[in-house]
Amino acid sequence: MSNTVVTGEVLDKSIREVVRILEDAVGCTAGPKGLTVAISKPYGSPEITKDGYKVMKSIKPEEPLAAAIASIITQSASQCNDKVGDGTTTCSILTAKVIEEVSKAKAAGSDIVSIKNGILKAKEAVLTALMSMRREVEEDEIAQVATLSANGDKNIGSKIAQCVKEVGKDGVITVEESKGFKDLEVEKTDGMQFDRGYLSPYFVTNAEKMLVEFENPYIFLTEKKINLVQSILPILENVARSGRPLLIIAEDVEGEALSTLVLNKLRGGLQVAAVKAPGFGDRRKDMLGDIAVIVGAKYVVNDELAVKMEDIALSDLGTAKSVRITKDATTIIGSVDSSSESIASRTNQIKAQIENSSSDYDKEKLRERLAKLSGGVAVLKVGGSSEVEVKERKDRVEDALHATRAAVEEGVVPGGGAALLYALSSLDGLKGKNDDEQWGIDIIRRAACAPIKRIIKNSGSEEAPCVIQHLLKQNDKELIYNVDTMNYANAFTSGVMDPLKVVRIAFDLAVSLAAVFMTLNAVVVDVPSKNDAAGAGAGGMGGMGGMGGF
């Protein structure tokens, strides 16, 4: 394997081509009238989706230079997805436009550093303007925000609003596939979520979404650190014989114990995952007790308990209908053995502690525990007549749920690309130090119009320039263009709102990514040599040598 260095016009041309391909594929999904994309799979039928992030991840050019450029862009999109769970499509549209405009500046021989300074100066002004437009989302507007993010599906919007009403704005809402034919159902169940993720990515069962997903697992709870596997070996053996997964919640799992669990998982043995217990000190002890009540565990093993880890039987462990673990959080859904009486008793105990406490801090922490214990979990069950239909609908439900959470967290701004358009007024008095810096400011002025133009284009209309001109003339920052009705309306009365957090992060990341490409002078890429190609072709089973490793 040799490599080559790509620079100059060849590099710039490749960047433009890759960005255009990504924008064409991802941008077509924008807006309520956006189109779907089919993604082929190694096995089975193609997946149909309107999820911009999923489309972007699936694009893997064969040519090494194009693949390297696409990888850089996808990493940025993944940051958008990780931070807010939505906005990838907007991010890709903005990135493509900024890079297109920067390419023109480069071709004209402009100073790239000055242009970059102008772009970053304009970015800060636009972000400040976006913040000034925000307003808190009202409870009756939650359905509208979710509907817009679900590409106009009012059923999804109303069901998400129902979930928020049942478990509260800070409650736990999850999405899972249903075996039934109903499009979408809401099920409220006992459960809890806490801010601790898996201790090793090797525990992941869903590699595409980097999740651990267990059905009907056993749950072992301890306040102690687990360093040696010997102490939990009887538990592991008993659970392995049952054929069910195991979740370990402990102060920590490290050293030999963690490496043994990972090795066992990689070899296809026991389905197991470990997470750290939430909280610290006495609060950790209390929260483990809360979890034990929810999952029906008889013991939380600690130094004060007469029962040792080695003596724990299957009947002493907790159970749940399902468990979902990300790198940051663990969600336990639907206890199996826990009774409503035990949860009621525990909540009454916490309420009494709140009444008797004189510390505001302690009261706040007790209220947090009470909310987690009594709030439960709302499960959005997605069904359909085919696997393709279910997966496409599930993508939209997840996007809508992320958008709803973002709206609750930071508020909303006028939707349909209008917020970025109106934020451009902040650039009117902004002047660059020189012509090239001013060019950078003007690049942001043109790029910020790209999302609304794309949304209008996806609706089948070619009237974007006229629409933009009309919106800016009215001097009303709540006015939007509704592509569903092909008419102008008030953003908040018509329900065409975007979560500020989604717009803000998508814009910020897009400009930052474009700035990276602006100063990119060379890319070193691997090029397969003739000897590599000959070696790969010798012997049809030659590729099996890697089976011995991980």
UniProtKB/Swiss-Prot annotation:
UniProtKB keywords: ATP-binding, Chaperone, Cytoplasm, Isomerase, Nucleotide-binding
Protein's organism: Anaplasma phagocytophilum (strain HZ)
Name of a matching Pfam family: Cpn60_TCP1
GO biological process, one term: protein refolding
Function: Together with its co-chaperonin GroES, plays an essential role in assisting protein folding. The GroEL-GroES system forms a nano-cage that allows encapsulation of the non-native substrate proteins and provides a physical environment optimized to promote and accelerate protein folding.
Localization annotation: Cytoplasm
Family designation: Belongs to the chaperonin (HSP60) family.
Residues reported in the UniProt entry to bind ATP: T29, A30, G31, P32, K50, D86, G87, T88, T89, T90, G416, D498
Name of the protein in its database record: Chaperonin GroEL
EC number: 5.6.1.7
Lineage, broadest ranks: Bacteria, Pseudomonadati, Pseudomonadota, Alphaproteobacteria, Rickettsiales
A GO term, aspect molecular function: ATP binding
The keyword Membrane is assigned to this record: no
